[in-house]
Every structure is written in structure tokens, then in C-alpha cells.
Regions:
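Conserved acetyl-CoA-binding loop-helix of GNAT-fold acetyltransferases
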Residues: 82-95, 120, 231-244, 269
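Conserved catalytic-core motifs of GNAT/GCN5-like acyltransferases
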Residues: 106-108, 119, 124-142, 255-257, ...
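Conserved GNAT acetyl-CoA-binding A-motif
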Residues: 97-111, 246-259
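Active-site rim helix/loop that mediates acceptor-substrate recognition in acyltransferases
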Residues: 21-52, 60, 170-204, 209
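A generic structural motif
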Residues: 62, 132, 211-212, 281
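Conserved N-terminal entry element of GNAT/NAT acetyltransferase domains
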Residues: 1-15, 143-165
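Conserved beta-strand in the GNAT
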Residues: 54-62, 68-75, 203-211, 217-224
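A short, internal acetyl-CoA/4′-phosphopantetheine-binding micro-motif in the GNAT/acyltransferase core
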Residues: 74-82, 223-231
Length: 294
């Protein structure tokens, strides 16, 4: 009986996904120790409110254990745009990253969003994904905080920038999603395609966390194989299974981030191309964005 005949492919439950994330990061941190002693990413939210307490601008980011920040969302109410509010909230989040000791910030933006804006703030493009989704380009940009960098100086705006709550993070995300929907054609809800391989004793020996977004882009979020079972093709089997299912659901492209120099060769062997490389994150290593057209 072959190895594959001894294993069963099953759908993953939520508890499986949480365990998968923990196992992936345990492995990562065994290779590259944490810089910040935090168990989960630290959420940073800055907002600007009007006299009635309504949020009119906001920016959110996440600080990671390897001394980096990912800026997730930035939004300004349409009535208040081009008045410096976005820059004020954005720079307030950047300031937190600097004060916490982060050495790099990175972020993503589509072609209809704010690439020129980020370039003016001293960011550099390191990854470009074409037709992602179809008809659009996706950019990833970065700024080093441990080296000299350029950017706009803060300007007076007539409003105070204050800390936001978790509820404010959700609100800012919802508002940005509403803006994005004016430019993107959602085809369906997000489709989870999380799978696991289980041995005869019921032990999970490999798993993938993946899915197809509303705009028909497939994402591989996490992939893990138990050390005892590595080198036997289980990771490739899960990736191929996901690719097949994603294509059946309408995906035209598969992308993945959080690919590092210790696992990039696996993706290259499975015919993924490198869209971009963020050097020296984590320190002394590289993070990659990869893709495959279906």
C-alpha cells in the first residue's frame, strides 16, 4: 500500500485552520526567531472623526513578530478627500511602526486605488500582478524605516487623529470594500477550499488553507506538512487539488504571499512564478509573492 493509499483527504474545520496557522508559525519561528515577543499580530488603527463623532478617515495596520508592519486599509470619506486627512491618518500609523521598532512597512494597492499616492510617500513597488483580477493590476510596495527615506511632511488638517477600536477597524474595512466594489465585479462570496490529509489513526499530517475570492482570484494562505511526512509529495498533492477546485469555481489565477526563501523552491517546482521579492524581511531573508495562471 502506497503512502497516499494510507491517507484520506478531508475538508478542514475551523479548529483545523487555527491549528494549521499555529504549526506554520512555529516552524517559521524555529528558522527565524521573533524580534518582537508577541503571540499574534498587533493591530494599529488611527481615525479622524467629525464634530458628530462620525469617522471620516482612517488607516489600519498590523505589526508582526519579525519587526514589520503591513498596512491593510486606508479610507477617506468622499466629502473630505484631497484635504490631507488620509495622509494624516496614514502617517500616524507609520509613526507607530517607527516607535515600535519596525524596520519595514509594506502594503498592497490596485491600479484604481492609490499607487501614485504611496510613491509620493516614499514607497517603492516590489511586486506587480497583472490581470489580478482580470482587467486590473495589483501592486505591493514597501518602505524601509531603518534607512533614510523620503515622504510628505505632515500638514495641518483642522482635525485630531485618534486611536481607533476593533469596531473602527471593521468600519474602515467595510467602507473601503464599498469603494472597491465600484471598480471590481464580484462574482460570488468567498469560497473556502481548506483541506487536510489524515492518516489511519485520525492524525492530520498535512493541510492547506486556501480559497477563491469574490473576484475569482485563488489564494493559498497557509500550507503545512508534518515533518515525518515531508518529501513525499503531500504538499504538491494539496496544492494540485486546490488548483483543480479553484479552476472549477472560476479562478483565473492563484497567488500566495508569505512565501520565504526556505519554501520558495517548492512553489517554483510546482510552476509558480515570482511576482516580487521583499528583501530583508525577516532580517537577512526574503519574502516572496508568487502566482500561477490557470
Amino acid at each position: 500500500m502506497t503512502m497516499m493509499e494510507k491517507l484520506r483527504l478531508r475538508r478542514s474545520a475551523r479548529k483545523d485552520s487555527l491549528r494549521l496557522e499555529n504549526l506554520v508559525y512555529q516552524y517559521y519561528f524555529s528558522l527565524v526567531p521573533k524580534v518582537f515577543d508577541i503571540d499574534e499580530e498587533v493591530t494599529v488603527c488611527k481615525k479622524i472623526i467629525d464634530k458628530d463623532g462620525n469617522i471620516i478617515a482612517g488607516c489600519t495596520g498590523y505589526i508582526y513578530s519579525w519587526a514589520g508592519m503591513y498596512i491593510d486599509d486606508m479610507w477617506v470619506d468622499e466629502k473630505y478627500r484631497r484635504q490631507g486627512l488620509g495622509s494624516a491618518a496614514f502617517q500616524a500609523v507609520e509613526k507607530v511602526a517607527e516607535e515600535r521598532g519596525c524596520h519595514v512597512i509594506w502594503l498592497g494597492t490596485w491600479d484604481f486605488q492609490a499607487k501614485p499616492y504611496y510613491l509620493k510617500h516614499g514607497y517603492t513597488v516590489f511586486s506587480t500582478l497583472y490581470e489580478c483580477p482580470v482587467g486590473h493590476e495589483d501592486y505591493e510596495l514597501y518602505k524601509r524605516l531603518d534607512k533614510e527615506h523620503t515622504g510628505r511632511k505632515p500638514q495641518p488638517i483642522g482635525f485630531e487623529v485618534v486611536d481607533g477600536s476593533e469596531e473602527d477597524v471593521d468600519y474602515i474595512c467595510e467602507q473601503l470594500d464599498g469603494y472597491n466594489k465600484k471598480h471590481l465585479n464580484d462574482k460570488h462570496d468567498y469560497i473556502k477550499i481548506n483541506r487536510k490529509l489524515v492518516n489511519k489513526d485520525g492524525k492530520v499530517v498535512a493541510a492547506i488553507m486556501a480559497g477563491v475570492t469574490e473576484v475569482d482570484v485563488g489564494w493559498i494562505w497557509k500550507l503545512w506538512v508534518d515533518e515525518e511526512y515531508r518529501g513525499q509529495g503531500l504538499g504538491t498533492l494539496l496544492v494540485k487539488h486546490f488548483e483543480k477546485k479553484a479552476k472549477e469555481k472560476g479562478a483565473t489565477k492563484i497567488i500566495s504571499e508569505e512565501i520565504f526563501d526556505w519554501n520558495i523552491d517548492f512553489f517554483k517546482k510546482n510552476n509558480y512564478s515570482v511576482a516580487g521579492e521583499l528583501k530583508d524581511f525577516p532580517n537577512g531573508r526574503s519574502m516572496y509573492y508568487v502566482y500561477k495562471d490557470l
